[in-house]
């Protein structure tokens, strides 16, 4: 591996074996065959991560998260990396839509998700399906098309033409768009103006510790105020503590997601009465404090 690395770096330089780099990059050498097997056999499952409505304290929807069934790929990002270097992103995009929606369909039939729940799909930002595959998706999922929420990520690698084309399709089928990782660093304000999403997912980097950081709390509050003028919902992503939950509710967010409520699972999470009660109690407390002018 060290010989391979130095051959592909600056001529005449000296390289030492780097175990961290080896762990990260060795999969690029060994993973192609495994990736092809996964694609050919459609060996991908989708875990669902619950999204909760602040207003009701109940399930609003679920984010579908890729889980390749493989000992080689320990993390989904490794699978995406190898697919990108192998020019196989289109196949991953197609399988994501096909298998995630199939999974959601099965849960609906088994009565495992609440009626009206949304399914959030992470689409690859620089990839778009052709008309044939889109028609197949529509035909196989005609009864749940309006349950779809397309998650888009505005980044340097994103193809803006593809992103807007996907949004047009989503609008035509009566579905919704969510802007993912808002505030993570790449031109978020511009993306908000140009993409006009139905939902904004505030990045975990802002939510983390917002109960102890007045600056973060101010950002969340101002974003909620801006979103309200555009009829856009705000989702707090990565809520991990009760203190963070209390603060984002005080800031006025509409939707919640994070390990505080539960981790992604192959069995869709349901809100317990205790969880619903906690959220609604915090809402009442926040309203009382607003009325008293303390927040």
List where the protein language model places each region:
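C-di-GMP signaling machinery
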Residues: 1-47, 55, 74, 82-89, ...
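Short beta-strand edge/capping elements of PAS-family sensory modules
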Residues: 60-63, 147
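Aromatic/hydrophobic pocket-lining residues that form π-stacking "cages" and hydrophobic walls in ligand
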Residues: 2, 100, 223
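Charged helix-capping and loop-helix junction motifs
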Residues: 30, 134-137, 164-165, 214-221
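Surface-exposed amphipathic alpha-helices with a cationic face
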Residues: 105, 142, 164-174, 221-228, ...
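EAL-family c-di-GMP phosphodiesterase catalytic domain
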Residues: 19-23, 53-58, 68-72, 124-127, ...
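Cytosolic catalytic headpiece of P-type ATPases
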Residues: 64, 75-78
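Catalytic core of bacterial c-di-GMP phosphodiesterases, primarily the EAL and HD-GYP domains
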Residues: 14, 90-164, 238
């Amino acid at each position: 591996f060290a010989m391979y690395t130095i051959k592909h770096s600056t001529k005449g330089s000296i390289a030492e074996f780097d175990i961290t780099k080896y762990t990260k990059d060795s999969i690029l050498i060994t993973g192609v065959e495994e990736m092809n097997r996964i694609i050919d056999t459609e060996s991908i499952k989708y875990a669902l991560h619950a999204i909760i409505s602040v207003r009701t304290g109940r399930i609003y929807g679920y984010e579908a998260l890729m889980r390749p069934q493989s000992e080689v790929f320990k993390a989904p990002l490794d699978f995406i990396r190898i697919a990108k270097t192998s020019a196989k992103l289109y196949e991953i995009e197609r399988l994501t839509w096909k298998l995630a929606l199939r999974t959601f369909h099965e849960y609906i039939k088994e009565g495992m998700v609440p009626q009206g729940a949304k399914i959030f799909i992470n689409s690859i930002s620089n990839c778009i399906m052709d008309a044939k595959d889109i028609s197949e998706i529509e035909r196989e999922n005609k009864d749940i098309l309006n349950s779809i929420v397309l998650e888009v990520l505005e980044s340097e690698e994103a193809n803006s033409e593809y992103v807007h084309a996907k949004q047009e399709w989503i609008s035509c089928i009566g579905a919704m768009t969510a802007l993912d990782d808002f505030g993570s660093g790449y031109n978020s304000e511009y993306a908000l103006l140009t993409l006009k999403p139905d939902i904004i997912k505030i990045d975990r980097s802002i939510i983390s510790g917002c109960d102890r950081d007045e600056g973060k709390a101010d950002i969340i509050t101002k974003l909620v105020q801006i979103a309200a003028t555009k009829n856009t919902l705000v989702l707090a992503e990565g809520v991990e503590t009760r203190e963070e939950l209390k603060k984002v509710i005080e800031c006025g967010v509409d939707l919640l997601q994070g390990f505080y409520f539960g981790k992604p699972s192959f069995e869709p999470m349901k809100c317990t009465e205790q969880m619903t009660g906690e959220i609604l109690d915090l809402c009442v407390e926040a309203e009382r404090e607003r009325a008293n002018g303390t927040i």
